[in-house]
Each structure stands twice: as structure tokens, then as C-alpha cells.
UniProtKB/Swiss-Prot annotation:
This is Aromatic amino acid aminotransferase. Its EC number is 2.6.1.57. Its cofactor is pyridoxal 5'-phosphate. InterPro entries: Aminotrans_II_pyridoxalP_BS (IPR001917), Aminotransferase_I/II_large (IPR004839), ArAT (IPR024892), HisP_aminotrans (IPR005861), HistidinolP_aminotransfase (IPR050106), PyrdxlP-dep_Trfase (IPR015424), PyrdxlP-dep_Trfase_major (IPR015421), PyrdxlP-dep_Trfase_small (IPR015422). The keyword Mitochondrion does not apply. The lineage of its organism: Bacteria, Bacillati, Actinomycetota, Actinomycetes, Mycobacteriales. One of its GO terms (biological process) is L-histidine biosynthetic process.
Length: 358
């Protein structure tokens, strides 16, 4: 007899990460191509030497470092194994069975997964024609069962960020009882000036989610954080799985904050490359939404899978999203040039239905 598991899991699609294979240029997972700084590598080595010891489940030193870095109280900081784990914890902390979690679509693929695993109901609101959050439609979709709203800004995978005024108007329209999570995983690449922490200080229902996986280059160690009202942080601590943020990750994150100036200076190069790649794609005839992150997006619709497969054959791995589009991570200049060589080829333009110029 087959062991019994939850029957509703058959209807839940598991999160699918970006693919990789030896020798390929991987522009599929929004990773930075630069490794940790020497000081961070030293912290990693020191922590690894004590791998026989359990990590600090209270994340005391890391929380203190985050609080000091951003000028908030330690009671306002929660830590998780990447910001995606905090997304899941937020659903568990806010929702009972049948409660609603709202988010735009297409947005971060983990949102529907963590929602349904918790027994909550995902409510999706389509993006606008320019691949941005339709905040008016989202505000109008709030019901008595809405408990949590994820707002990914810059939006993954489409790229645009929301302005402060847009978010203020949205937050003013959403009931205070609804938790609004501003998922700012790509905050460090956003040059618009919008900072979720400014909104956290004015709206007690705002949670700011950030990560050390992207600009800080610690994707392999899995550490992220939430800044929120103390009551929300206390609730997160009750649904947190013990010891999931390991000692190496905590030490690396503390060292990364200490070196944040040098690490964040790297993002200027990524932003410059992002703009260069987008301009080249626009010049080649592609539709490319504005991006405030470390990637660009091609809304190729039903051609997305074929485009991604052809790029992989050319040695460049991208991230297709069903029949919606393809996301391209900004890599090193040489990696970006390899992608552009493919994207401007006759084959790629034919697949994408982009006119081949004489």
C-alpha cells in the first residue's frame, strides 16, 4: 500500500529552479558572477571550522548587525533561510485554511507554492500591459478573507519597480489588518530611490523582505531577513523552523554587512550592463520592459520555450516562463555579449518573431 500524503499536493506545482550544465553560460537564476570578498571568505572559513556546533537559532549577532545597519530595533528584525523562507513563514503566520494571499501575476514563482502548501488560497491579479503591478486592481480585489499581499518590487521576472507614491496610494487603500510584504530581493539594483524601509516606518502592516542572495553574493548560503512591526516579527518566530539559518550563513551575512560599501559598489557595474543589454535588445527590435533589477525580460508569449531552448543550444541558459516570457540574468560583459550574439542572430529573431533587419 502506498503511504498516504495530502491529496491536494497533487495539484501544487513544485518550484522549479534555473537549470545549469557544465560549460554553459548560466543567465537563468539571477546570481551575481562575483564571489564573496576576502573578508567574507575568511568569515565563512572560520565558521565552517566549528561546523560541529549548532548555529544560534536566535540569530542574535546577525539581527543586531542588521538592526544597526538599517537603524531599526532588533525587535523589528527576523532572519530566514533566504527571503523565500520568510515568505512561507509569513503565510503561516497570517493565514488559516481558506484565507487569501494576493499577489500579481506573473511574479515570483514561489508565492503560489508557499500559499497553497499552507492551505491558503492564492488570489492573482494580472500585471498591466507594461508588465507592472496593477495596484488599483489589487486594492479592489481585497476581501474579508485577504490576510497577506506580496508586492515584488522590482518585480521578478518582469523587472519594473514601483514608485514611493504608487505604494503610498496602495497602502492607504488597503485595510490595516492586511499584511503587505514588500519583496525587495533586488533592492540593491534599483536606482529609482524607492525604499521599503521608509514605508515600514509609516505603515505598521508593512513587512520589508530582503536577501543576501543577490547583490551580496551569498545565494549558496541561504540567508535573508524581514523588517517589520515587532508583533509580526514575534509571530514569525513561532513558525520558524529551528536551525535553518546555518552558522556559516550567519557569519557570512555579518561580514557582508561590514563590507557593504564595497559589495554594493559592484551593483553599479551590473546596472550599467543591464542598461547596455536592454538598449541592444531594443535596437534589435525586441520588446523589453523597463528593469530595475539584475535581469531583463522578453515577453515572447508562446515562443518563450523555443527561444530558451535555442539559446541553451547556443550555450547560454535563460529562464523561460511558460507561455509568458523569458528572463535573462545580467552576467559579466562577455556572458552578456554571448547572449546578445544569440539574440540578434537570424535564428533567434525568427523564433521571437522579430523582424530581421538588412
Amino acid at each position: 500500500m502506498t503511504p498516504r500524503t495530502r491529496t491536494d499536493l497533487d495539484t501544487i506545482t513544485a518550484y522549479v529552479p534555473g537549470k545549469s550544465y557544465p560549460g554553459a553560460i548560466k543567465l537563468a537564476s539571477n546570481e551575481t558572477t562575483l564571489g564573496p570578498l576576502p573578508s567574507v571568505r575568511d568569515a565563512i572559513a572560520d565558521a565552517a571550522a566549528n561546523a560541529n556546533r549548532y548555529p544560534d537559532n536566535g540569530h542574535v549577532a546577525l539581527i543586531a548587525a542588521i538592526a544597526d545597519h538599517f537603524g531599526v530595533a532588533t525587535a523589528n528584525v527576523a532572519v530566514g533561510a533566504g527571503s523565500v523562507s520568510l515568505c512561507q513563514e509569513l503565510v503561516h503566520a497570517t493565514c488559516n485554511d481558506g484565507d487569501e494571499v494576493m499577489f500579481a501575476w506573473r511574479s515570483f514563482e514561489a508565492y503560489p507554492v508557499v500559499t497553497r502548501v499552507a492551505g491558503a488560497v492564492p488570489v492573482t491579479v494580472p500585471l498591466t500591459a507594461d508588465y507592472r503591478h496593477d495596484l488599483d486592481a489589487m486594492a479592489a480585489a481585497v476581501t474579508d478573507r485577504t490576510r497577506l499581499i506580496f508586492v515584488c518590487t522590482p518585480n521578478n521576472p518582469t523587472g519594473p519597480a514601483l514608485s514611493t507614491s504608487e505604494l503610498e496610494r496602495f497602502l492607504d487603500a488597503v485595510p490595516d489588518r492586511v499584511v503587505v510584504a514588500l519583496d525587495e530581493a533586488y533592492f540593491e539594483y534599483n536606482r529609482s530611490g524607492t525604499d521599503g524601509l521608509d514605508l515600514f516606518r509609516r505603515y505598521p502592516n508593512v513587512v520589508v523582505l530582503r536577501t543576501f542572495s543577490k547583490a551580496y553574493g551569498l545565494a549558496g548560503l541561504r540567508v535573508g531577513y524581514a523588517i517589520a512591526d515587532a508583533a509580526i516579527v514575534a509571530a514569525l518566530s513561532k513558525v520558524h523552523i529551528a536551525f535553518t539559518v546555518n552558522a556559516v550563513a550567519q557569519a557570512a551575512a555579518i561580514a557582508s554587512l561590514a563590507a557593504s560599501g564595497e559589495l554594493l559598489a559592484r551593483t553599479d557595474g551590473v546596472v550599467a550592463e543591464r542598461n547596455r543589454v536592454r538598449d541592444a535588445l531594443l535596437a534589435a527590435g525586441y520588446e523589453v520592459p523597463e528593469s530595475d533589477a539584475n535581469f531583463v525580460y522578453l515577453p515572447l508569449g508562446s515562443r518563450s520555450g523555443a527561444f530558451g531552448a535555442a539559446s541553451a543550444e547556443a550555450g547560454v541558459l535563460l529562464r523561460p516562463y511558460g507561455d509568458d516570457g523569458v528572463r535573462i540574468t545580467i552576467g559579466d560583459p562577455e556572458e552578456n555579449d554571448a547572449f546578445l550574439a544569440f539574440a540578434t542572430s537570424t535564428e533567434a529573431r525568427s523564433i521571437a518573431n522579430v523582424a530581421v533587419r538588412a
